[in-house]
Amino acid sequence: MKVIFPGSFDPITNGHMDLISRASKLFDQVVVVISNNTSKHSLFTPEEKDHLVTEALSKFSNVSVELIQTDLTINVVKKFNADAIIRGIRNTRDFTYEQEIALMNKKLDSDIETITLFSNPEVSFI
């Protein structure tokens, strides 16, 4: 199964790394998609984020990194022929937010699933 893990990764955190590590053990292929979040002020340029994330994830043989700034996540899932989107959940606020996004994605394409992984408490706020 191939999954997409989208995010702004500005910067990539220990929480992201933990989730990606766990996902790499559960799924055949994980595509980390660096996207633009217009509601956040970026610390790094897209190219810098791409370099940092690619370097951080180089030890995972089944994880790839893609820089896609201007497309809906659901379209990226289709572009990479992925089976699902993975998201991390730290708390109830994250759950509510991710549920709303998952429901919208389901309306856009009923075949795409969203799979959530609960954050490891040791890295959920790092």
Give the residues covered by each predicted segment.
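Nucleotidyltransferase catalytic core that binds NTPs
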Residues: 1-126
